[in-house]
Every structure is written in C-alpha cells, then in structure tokens.
C-alpha cells in the first residue's frame, strides 16, 4: 500500500503536525463543518462555534489517532481496530465523511506548511489518509 518513500514522507511531515494536534485538528473539523455542513449531524451535542473547547478536544483526538496510524504504518488495522469498531458499530459514521475529513486535513497542512507539502509529500499523505479511511471503514462490510 504505502511505499518506503511514502512512509518516509508521512513520518517527516508528521513531526511538524504532531506538535499542533489540537490546533490542526480543530481547524480541520471547523473547515469540514463549514464546507460540508451535513457532517455536523454526528455532533449534535457539541458546541460547533469557532474556538469551541469540544471541537478542539475532538480535533486533538482525531490528529492523535492519525498519529497512532503513523506510528504503526505496517499495522494500521491493528492500531486503529477500536476506532474502526466504534465508528462502524456505535457511531455509524457514513464512510464518505472520512474522505471529506482527509481533504480538509490536507488543506490545513497546506495552509500551515506550504513548503513542506511538496507534490510528493501530498501524494504520500493522500495515500496514507486513504489507507486510514479504509481501515476505519473495514468493519462496515
């Protein structure tokens, strides 16, 4: 799935991302809620206003979960097993939303790290985020 080059690219940019988990995660969610308002339906109990503590906390969880996948690039399925079960069985998140989130996350990284998000790194991150999405939707089948 991910080549050695892809893995190196993902790990390299992740060192810039992980220290901003809450900020980038919240920004990603806010962007997703704005651009794709239907995604708000999964968060009826959240204060979705800009700067919301709930959005910041959940954004941090999302980025940290992606970080867990980065730390286990050769076994993302094992690393994200509980999240896969949660999203498929309990939360019943429409799988398309993972693609929307990934797209918004790439935009956030492009805003904050334009020089680091080279075409090669962008392609590697896209493959990585697709792989994470596949893992999270595996329990839907």
From Swiss-Prot:
The protein's role, per its UniProt record: Involved in oxygen transport from the lung to the various peripheral tissues.
Provenance organism: Sphenodon punctatus
More details: Sphenodon Hbs have properties not found in other reptiles: poor cooperativity, high affinity for oxygen, small Bohr and haldane effects, appreciable phosphate effects (those properties are also found in the Hbs of primitive urodele and caecilian amphibians).
PROSITE patterns the record matches: GLOBIN
Protein's name according to its UniProt entry: Hemoglobin subunit alpha-A
Alphabetized Pfam families for the sequence: Globin
GO biological process: hydrogen peroxide catabolic process
Gene Ontology CC: one annotated term: blood microparticle
Family designation: Belongs to the globin family.
Binding site for O2: 58
SUPFAM superfamilies: Globin-like
List of residues binding heme b: 87
Keyword Metal-binding: yes
Tissue-by-tissue expression: Red blood cells.
UniProt-listed InterPro entries: Globin, Globin-like_sf, Globin/Proto, Hemoglobin_a-typ, Hemoglobin_oxygen_transport, Hemoglobin_pi
């Amino acid at each position: 799935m991910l080549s050695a080059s892809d893995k190196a690219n993902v790990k390299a940019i992740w060192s810039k991302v992980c220290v901003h988990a809450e900020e980038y995660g919240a920004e990603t969610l806010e962007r997703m809620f704005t651009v794709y308002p239907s995604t708000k339906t999964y968060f009826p109990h959240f204060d979705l206003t800009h700067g919301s503590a709930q959005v910041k906390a959940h954004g941090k969880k999302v980025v940290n979960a992606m970080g867990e996948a980065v730390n286990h690039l050769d076994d993302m399925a094992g690393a994200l097993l509980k999240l896969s079960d949660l999203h498929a069985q309990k939360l019943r998140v429409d799988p398309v939303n993972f693609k929307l989130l990934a797209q918004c996350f790439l935009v956030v990284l492009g805003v904050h790290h334009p020089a680091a998000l080279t075409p090669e790194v962008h392609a590697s991150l896209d493959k990585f985020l697709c792989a994470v999405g596949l893992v999270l939707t595996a329990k839907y089948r």
